[in-house]
């Protein structure tokens, strides 16, 4: 491991000065940050992310964190001898699996991240979409074409949900009291059934309801890549749809970009897909001229 470069006091002051207009831009604005399970990585990475979230709050930004946990869920299921199955990029979640998913997301990852933020000097509150009926959901359905018969079939994903409504009562109270909400992507149906919700989709629904200034999707890739695998720094909704249609955007990036489009259509000003493994990625995106990742806008 190489030593970090030494920055002179003058350079440190210059960096802070250059960040001022960006800080003013986001003053009292709400930023929703989806922190993916792959982006969490090691403990030091998660703690650095937590410090950056506290810094945002200290600069009068209102951060709302939504976290994933796919790798951690997979690890726990493997330990318990429960096989993981996926369809259309979503985990098929049966009755046994939803209990593990809730335990890992709301009981382990959520509280760990809350602890890191509080340790860094923030005041975080850990919740999931079930708390206060914050996020209500309905059963998600997907279709797939059978490769042999070419017949379209409906896939039963089990207890996987799609957000239907976001009640902002609890979130607005927390934000108004300068607390940092940390949300696990679980929701409940009208009948009280718990649903596992894709974290990107959950974050998009929350950001749209809040009319957030920015939605940041921290993942394990640099952003949207072109056909030469180079980062595309900026896209309009129209551009993004063209890239989906011609196959440039494919695989797991499609639902991420569709979440971005949905959030923008709900009133979010801009959405960024960026690499959460890059140190201080959130600060680089919000407080520097260059930014990082791919910005998608109207």
UniProtKB/Swiss-Prot annotation:
CDD domains: AAK_NAGK-C
Pfam families recorded: AA_kinase
Entry's localization field: Cytoplasm
Cellular component, GO annotation: cytoplasm
Swiss-Prot/TrEMBL catalytic activity: N-acetyl-L-glutamate + ATP = N-acetyl-L-glutamyl 5-phosphate + ADP
Class of this enzyme: transferase
One of the protein's GO biological processes: L-arginine biosynthetic process
Domain of life assignment: Bacteria
Major place of residence: cytoplasm
Keywords: Amino-acid biosynthesis, Arginine biosynthesis, ATP-binding, Cytoplasm, Kinase, Nucleotide-binding, Transferase
Example of a GO MF term: ATP binding
Amino-acid positions noted as binding substrate in the UniProt annotation, renumbered to this chain: 69-70, 91, 196
EC number(s) on file: 2.7.2.8
Pathway assigned to this chain's UniProt record: Amino-acid biosynthesis; L-arginine biosynthesis; N(2)-acetyl-L-ornithine from L-glutamate: step 2/4
Annotated site residue numbers, Transition state stabilizer: 34, 256
UniProt key word Lyase: no
Function according to Swiss-Prot or TrEMBL: Catalyzes the ATP-dependent phosphorylation of N-acetyl-L-glutamate.
Family: Belongs to the acetylglutamate kinase family. ArgB subfamily.
Cross-referenced NCBIfam families: argB
Protein name: Acetylglutamate kinase
């Amino acid at each position: 491991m190489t030593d970090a470069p030494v920055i002179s006091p003058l350079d440190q002051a210059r960096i802070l000065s250059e960040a001022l207009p960006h800080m003013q831009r986001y003053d009292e604005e709400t930023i929703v940050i989806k922190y993916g399970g792959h982006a969490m990585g090691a403990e030091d990475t998660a703690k650095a992310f937590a410090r950056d979230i506290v810094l945002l709050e200290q600069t009068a930004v209102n951060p709302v964190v939504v976290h994933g946990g796919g790798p951690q869920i997979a690890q726990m299921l493997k330990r318990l001898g429960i096989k993981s199955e996926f369809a259309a990029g979503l985990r098929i979640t049966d009755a046994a699996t939803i209990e593990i998913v809730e335990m890992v997301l709301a009981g382990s990852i959520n509280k760990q991240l809350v602890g890191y933020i509080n340790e860094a000097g923030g005041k975080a509150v850990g919740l999931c979409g079930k708390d206060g009926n914050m996020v209500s959901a309905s059963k998600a359905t997907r279709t797939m074409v059978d490769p042999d018969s070419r017949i379209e079939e409906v896939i039963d994903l089990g207890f996987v949900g799609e957000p239907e409504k976001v009640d902002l009562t609890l979130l607005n109270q927390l934000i108004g009291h300068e607390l940092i909400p940390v949300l696990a992507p679980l929701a409940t149906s009208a009948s009280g059934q718990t649903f596992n919700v894709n974290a990107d989709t959950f974050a998009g629904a929350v950001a749209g309801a809040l009319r957030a200034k920015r939605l940041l999707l921290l993942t394990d890739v640099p952003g949207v890549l072109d056909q030469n695998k180079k980062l595309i720094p900026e896209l309009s909704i129209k551009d993004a749809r063209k890239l989906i249609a011609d196959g440039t955007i494919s695989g797991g990036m499609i639902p991420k970009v569709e979440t971005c489009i949905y959030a923008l259509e709900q009133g979010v000003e801009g959405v960024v897909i960026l690499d959460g493994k890059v140190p201080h990625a959130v600060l680089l995106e919000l407080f520097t001229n260059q930014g990082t990742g791919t910005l998608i806008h109207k």
